[in-house]
Structure formats: structure tokens, C-alpha cells
Curated annotation (Swiss-Prot):
Residues 1-41 are annotated as: Disordered. The gene is grpE. Coiled coil: none annotated. InterPro entries: GrpE, GrpE_coiled_coil, GrpE_head. Its main location: cytoplasm. This is Protein GrpE. One of its GO terms (biological process) is protein folding. The lineage of its organism: Bacteria, Pseudomonadati, Pseudomonadota, Gammaproteobacteria, Enterobacterales. Belongs to the GrpE family. Participates actively in the response to hyperosmotic and heat shock by preventing the aggregation of stress-denatured proteins, in association with DnaK and GrpE. It is the nucleotide exchange factor for DnaK and may function as a thermosensor. Unfolded proteins bind initially to DnaJ; upon interaction with the DnaJ-bound protein, DnaK hydrolyzes its bound ATP, resulting in the formation of a stable complex. GrpE releases ADP from DnaK; ATP binding to DnaK triggers the release of the substrate protein, thus completing the reaction cycle. Keywords: Chaperone, Cytoplasm, Stress response. It is found in: Cytoplasm.
Length: 196
């Protein structure tokens, strides 16, 4: 037996012992200095940063486009709703003089004359049916007295002293006003009470 074989533990070949000793030693990688950085790594990092920035810009553009689309859809819906609501405005404006004429005819008619009673009744029924029809389409009459003056629906043409009506309230309606779905299409011409 040689001296090498004597030093090895029983049953182990000398190669196995050397392998075990190498396993105990940690692999040490050589340190890379800043000067030895691979230029490809730097280029990859630069390209990744550019890609992230481009993705961020694209995301912002998509969000802005979606917001613009939502705003356009909302505006279009509002415009369509207004068009439906106020499509009758011109037609109602054309009917107002007819309604006013029927009102004036009733004011001046001699209701005490029995010969005119059928005509007066016909005018009243015609006016009532016309007002019923326009009410179905959102038209409301502004003709209340003893209510506070509202510049949105009233046009004051005179101020008169009154003890019966509070100052600043509508005393009399000279010409009725009308609204269409809440929008004033003709303000009521009124006289307003003032304090003595």
C-alpha cells in the first residue's frame, strides 16, 4: 500500500476527498468595476426607461380620449333632450297671439246679453281646449297675482300704490306669460304694488 492510500479514510477514493474539499470552498466571482459594465446592459436599461415612458404617455392619451368620448356622449344626450323638450317653442310662440285674442274676446264680450251667450260659451270652450292641449306638451300659464315679482317670469310695466297687496308683489297681470318645460317663452306683463 502506498502512503496516499494509507491516509484516506476507509472506503473512499482519493478523488472523492478532493471533490468534498472543493465543495466546501465558495465560488468567488471577480468584482466588476464600473468601467467594466457591459454597454449592452446600459442600453437595455435606457430602452426599458423609454418604453415605460412611452407606455405612460399612451395610457394618458387613452384616458384623455375616453374622457373626451364620455363628455361628447353626455353633451349629445343633453342636446337631444333639449331638442325634444323645446322643439315646440316656435309652434307655441305662434299660438300665443291666438290664445291672447280668445282671452281678449272673453274680456270684452257682453256676458249679460243672452243672445251672445252661445258665442261666449264657444269662445270659453275653445280657449279651454287649446290651453289643455298646450299643457300636455309642457306649456304653463303665468297669470298669478299677489305673488312676489320674479324677473325670470314677470316684466314690470308699472308700479301702483296698493293697500291690499304687499309692496313688491304682482298687483295685476296685463298680459299673461307662458313657460315651456320651465323655460320662459314669454314673460307676463304686470303691474307691481308699491308701498304708500
Amino acid at each position: 500500500m502506498s502512503s496516499k492510500e494509507q491516509k484516506t479514510p476507509e472506503g473512499q477514493a482519493p478523488e472523492e476527498i478532493i471533490t468534498e474539499q472543493h465543495d466546501d470552498v465558495e465560488a468567488v466571482e471577480p468584482e466588476v468595476s464600473a468601467e467594466q459594465v457591459d454597454p449592452r446592459d446600459e442600453k437595455i436599461a435606457n430602452l426599458e426607461a423609454q418604453l415605460a415612458e412611452a407606455q405612460k404617455r399612451e395610457r394618458e392619451v387613452m384616458l384623455r380620449a375616453k374622457a373626451d368620448e364620455d363628455n361628447l356622449r353626455r353633451r349629445t344626450e343633453q342636446d337631444i333632450e333639449k331638442a325634444h323638450k323645446f322643439a315646440l317653442e316656435k309652434f307655441v310662440n305662434e299660438l300665443l297671439p291666438v290664445i291672447d285674442s280668445l282671452d281678449r274676446a272673453l274680456e270684452v264680450a257682453d256676458k249679460a246679453n243672452p243672445e251672445l251667450a252661445p258665442m261666449v260659451e264657444g269662445i270659453e270652450l275653445t280657449l279651454k281646449s287649446m290651453l289643455d292641449v298646450v299643457r300636455k306638451f309642457g306649456v304653463e300659464v303665468i297669470a298669478d297675482t299677489n305673488v312676489p315679482l320674479d324677473p325670470n317670469v314677470h316684466q314690470a310695466i308699472a308700479m301702483v300704490e296698493s293697500e291690499d297687496v304687499a309692496a313688491g308683489n304682482v298687483l295685476a297681470v296685463m298680459q299673461k306669460g307662458y313657460t315651456l318645460n320651465g323655460r320662459t317663452i314669454r314673460a307676463a306683463m304686470v303691474t307691481v304694488a308699491k308701498a304708500k
